[in-house]
């Protein structure tokens, strides 16, 4: 047996900084701007710990996963480094470590331009409590930088390393500053994207220049009333409801789906709500039954005069680019699958938010 990095240097993962002029900053402090996360009890989380605990033990644990977390800033540094401390590393055989436990970087060509994907801060395979990594630019000029956080790992601290003499400023606001809130399953959380910036929420965020909150809870999105009561009070530009395949049975889905929709609709009568079904083209009998349950939620809302509810089937979401080939394991999307979802859902969100 041999190590591929011994024969192909492109697979060597460098974790040393090797920068004499580096200065580190805590990502929680100004002028850095944190999105999609809060900081409680010494760690990052996606909703308050008390609210998560009130939903279920599983949601309380997964709440520490930093899916959808981002930090944004403007700098002219020739490089951006990270030093991350993590106390839970998500490792799965069908999920790239750069996605489950890595950070990646998006940037603009100037201080106000559209974001472009640069690359991942690739973690070492054997890391135990975090890692350090650096990404270089080929020139020194002011640009917006966005660092996406790991999808399935827990983060205690993040320090960002920049040239000691660099410009460091607050990033401009998102064009759509009220977040789109996504609630759902492992797919919503980001499995199995190759890096955090490849999830459909991140792609849509770049498409629309919008903030977002990822409330995907792997295997644990059951449409609980406690979760509905938490979400209904959030300030948001749109809500995406996507958990049909996490309900244990069709009966469970029937008992919770419309109830969750109504809870949020009563609290926010004018909020655009998009209902999704599982992203899959080749449906079995149970898939069809589950789709019929969520379609009934939609049909009933329309019947009662709701003009701000929308339904996108999973087969429609996937057919744009990929069909069923966009799934890793007949459940979780590949990067191409996420892109297909992002195109179709993003076009709808653009229409309904910006109308």
Where are these regions (language model features)?
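N-terminal secretory targeting modules
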Residues: 1-179, 346, 350-355
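Serine-esterase "nucleophile elbow" of acetyl-processing enzymes
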Residues: 137-139, 145-221, 225-235
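Structural motif
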Residues: 146-148, 240-242, 274
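Active-site-proximal beta-strand/loop segments in catalytic clefts of secreted hydrolases
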Residues: 184, 215-218, 242-245, 276-279, ...
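A general structural detector for well-ordered alpha-helical segments in enzyme core domains, enriched
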Residues: 200, 256-260, 290-297
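Oxyanion-hole/transition-state-stabilizing segment in secreted/luminal serine hydrolases
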Residues: 204, 221-259, 263-267, 278-283
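A short helix->loop->beta-strand "cap" motif at the edges of active sites that frequently abuts
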Residues: 268-273
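Catalytic His-Asp segment of secreted/periplasmic serine-dependent ester chemistry enzymes
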Residues: 283-355
